[in-house]
């Protein structure tokens, strides 16, 4: 029996003003994550009559849960850059000299008041400069 690898493909959908993360899982005997397709009509990336979109792997990371996480970019069925693929536009202007990233912050809040729970400070630095 062949050894199978499991890949979880992750991409951004076409919802605006903010895209959502999407994923789907593929089990295959291939050593690297292959290109894959999905129905873009359910992710705001295609019309119902012609809904195929392509997922092209960009970077793969090992996951402690036993499958690989595959960050992808979306292309239309004709292999052109999909309008929701902002990574392709960024790749055109970024060189090896540039670094950029995304930071996502999380705060626990009281569901009744919406106020942050716990410490009032974002970090412990500059605690003496906080004015209440």
PLM features per residue range, with description:
Residues 1-93:
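Acidic/polar, glycine-rich intrinsically disordered N-terminal extensions of enzymes
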Residues 103-105, 129:
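Acidic-residue sensor for enzyme active/binding pockets
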Residues 113-121:
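Enzymes and membrane/adaptor proteins characterized by extended Gly/Ser/Thr/Asp/Glu-rich
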Residues 105-114:
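Short, conserved secondary-structure transition motifs
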Residues 96-103:
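Flexible, glycine/charged-enriched surface loops at secondary-structure junctions
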Residues 122-131:
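Single conserved hydrophobic/aromatic residue that forms the stacking wall/gate
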Residues 14, 24, 111, 128-129:
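Residue-level marker of positions within ordered structural domains that often coincide
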